[in-house]
Amino acid sequence: LAYFKETCIGGESMRKKIRVAGVVNDSIVDGPGFRFSVFVQGCPHGCPGCHNPKTHPFEGGVMMEPEEILERMKKNPLLKGITLSGGEPFCQAEALAYLARQVHAAGWDVVCYTGYTLETLLAMEDPHIRELLEEVDLLIDGPFILEKRDLTLLFRGSSNQRLILVKPTLQTGSITLMEEDV
């Protein structure tokens, strides 16, 4: 956990903007429905076989205001929501929690990928991580494990990753998985 705090939590300027590696305006593979996918820059996991290794360095990418992302989303009336991927979204939890609140206020849903497990995120007891979790509808958790790679899985790359419905999970304290027949 100390490594997370040292590596992922940036200075004050990092919290106001989001360091973005790239965006996909209309993805159909990063969650249910048409999605606006934001790939954040910076990841401490370094999973062998990662789909997005260029997102690992914490330098690079571009700094974007959450409002700029929202304005881009508003241009596509077919969107179901936003997907936060990376990189590691929880390394920018404060700014992404703010963005996710605005996304919900506009009527969209929030999907988030993380290389952490939900249990690890909750154990960090970081208020910004908790704020982001509370704004996520569907969490795809766990690191990509090359030996468990399975291209038949819905929205995941390896069989250890889970599709967690966050709101009922936080309410009950028991993991609620998404049905995979969407």
Describe the function of each predicted region.
Residues H45:
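Glycine-centered loop/turn positions within well-structured domains
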Residues I9-F39, P48, N52-F58, I175-T176, ...:
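N-terminal [4Fe-4S]-dependent radical SAM core
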Residues Q92-H104, V111, R149-V182:
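P-loop/Walker A phosphate-binding loop and immediately adjacent motor/lid segment at beta-alpha junctions
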